[in-house]
Every structure is written in structure tokens, then in C-alpha cells.
Amino acid sequence: SSTATLMTRGNWAVTRVRERIAAFSGYNENALEPLQVVRYHPGEKYEPHHDLFDLCDLPQKPRRHLTFLIYLNTMDENAGAHTTFPRLKVSIPPKAGTALVFNDVLDNGHDDERTEHGGAAPAAGVKYAINCWIRARSPDRASWMPKGEEGLFGRLAGGLMGA
């Protein structure tokens, strides 16, 4: 896969996406890392990994608590390109305008090993998505989930990038 960082300065679309992620998550926008666009051509994949932190960043930066993966295009169910969670045996196909949202840590602050995930290679076509990670020094929120919601994953219906 290939990646590019999207800078906020002077870019209203990037600013708006960041504002909506902050509003949805309940975290301050300052906790968001810069948005990162990712592109997968046929045969390109991202091996299973955790988004907890970058070892090069420690101890200077807080660890990642929450991951947003925003799908920019829809891929046919049979075209591969799913986001896979091997430990959970879950595979999610990309659908434009939706986002996969998950905690990287448990409510008690420990690593959530279940969120190991990878990007499967597209068999045909190109997959585009935006990553956003939210960092915090301590779990200042027990969970990103709104009260009354349960489960490991959340999806933003109605298009995160819409007005």
C-alpha cells in the first residue's frame, strides 16, 4: 500500500473531516494525528498489526487509543480489499462514505489484542481510505462509544464526509 499525510492548514475538507471525527469520538481535536490517505493496488496488502503506538514515538507522545478508518470507495464483495481482524474472524468490505471505528485499548487502559487487523489485497480495482488515530496519555474516556451503545466496532452511516 501507499500512504500520504493530509495537512490541515488551508484545506477546508481535511479540517471538516477532523472536526467530525473529534465530535463523534468525544476527544479534543488536538488528540487527533494528521489524516493519512492509504491506497491499495491489486496485490498490495497491509499485514495484520496493532495501531497502539509507534515504538519510535515513545515516551514522547501519548499512545493511540482509537482508530478511524474511513472508506473512500466501494469495492465489490468479491474483489478482496477487506479490512480483516484475524483474532475476531471478522472481515469488513470497504463501502464509500462509511468508517470503521475501534478502540485500540480496553476500558481499563490495557491493550486490546482483539483489534489486530490488516488490509487484504484487492483482486481488482484500487482501494482508497483515510486513517485517523487518536492519542491520549490516559484513558480520559472509558470508551469512544456513546452511552447505550455496545460492541467493539462502530460504523458512521450517512457519510462522515458529508455536510
How does the language model describe each region?
Residues 1-163:
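Fe(II)/2-oxoglutarate oxygenase catalytic core
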